[in-house]
Amino acid sequence: MPPMISFRHFSAAPWSSSSLSTSKSSRIFLAKLFLGFCLVISQITTACGDDETHPTLDSIRSSLIRQEDTIVFGLIERAKYPTNTPLYNNTSSRFPGTLFEYFVKRSEALQSKVGRYLSPEEHPFFPDDLPPPLFEPKSQSIEQFLHPISLNVSHEIWDIYLEKLLPLLAKKGDDENYAVTASSDLQLLQALSRRIHCGKIVAEVKFRDNPDKYKEAIRGQDRDALMKLVTFEAVEEKVKKRVAKKARVFGRQVTLEHTDNATETYKVDPPLVSRVYEDWVMPLTKKVEIEYLLRRLDD
């Protein structure tokens, strides 16, 4: 049986003001959460392309390249902490599910109120019973650009992250810094989800650029044909090389002494970052593209 969670950071009630005020870890968590909400506000109407009304493949690719920075930095941030498995495995009578699930549900509920999920590329991991936003978006042009299809692969992203990526990214151990660990997890998960769900916009742009080429495969529900149409191997190779290079640049250990490149160490392994894109990010993005296209001609 795994060890029980230490609730020394959450005495009395997990979110009581008295417990939070005495916990350095919790104060850090609140500061990061507040910053996250500020970022949410700035991204509410941000689509995957620079031009929300008429995104192009070039504008979308520019956005995806910028999102690489967020994901690489997110991987570096999460790699700072050990696996902290009690965060994901143990439950308590104080809340349903694991501590991480509780953290994500409460965070998503608050982020829903400030409008995070008004953007078509933003999808919650726990969509049930989310509160409505406190305001209406100024513009929904990107939603009008897309075909009205409900598509969400967040659960698949969640499972891959916890079961496959996290064991490769974090060293084994438990430092009991569950608040900051959960915060870095959620920021990385949301960055991955946003990038992957941009596949809907990518698919729509590709369809509009050459509808006749896609319609035949869509009418025949031919997944293999659609996979060939949405796959650009040369582009994918560039992406893998670029994110690995970013991991080397962003994750370099900076010292005042001269360091031999052969012995240089990084905060996150560059080949792992490349693998994240090769094994999970790009395949899931193409899955979103194909699922979207298969229903593109539906009334």
Would you name each region that the model predicts?
Residues 1-33:
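N-terminal chloroplast transit peptides
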Residues 31-42:
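Cleavable N-terminal signal peptides of Sec/SRP-targeted secreted and luminal proteins
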Residues 41-299:
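Extended amphipathic alpha-helical regions
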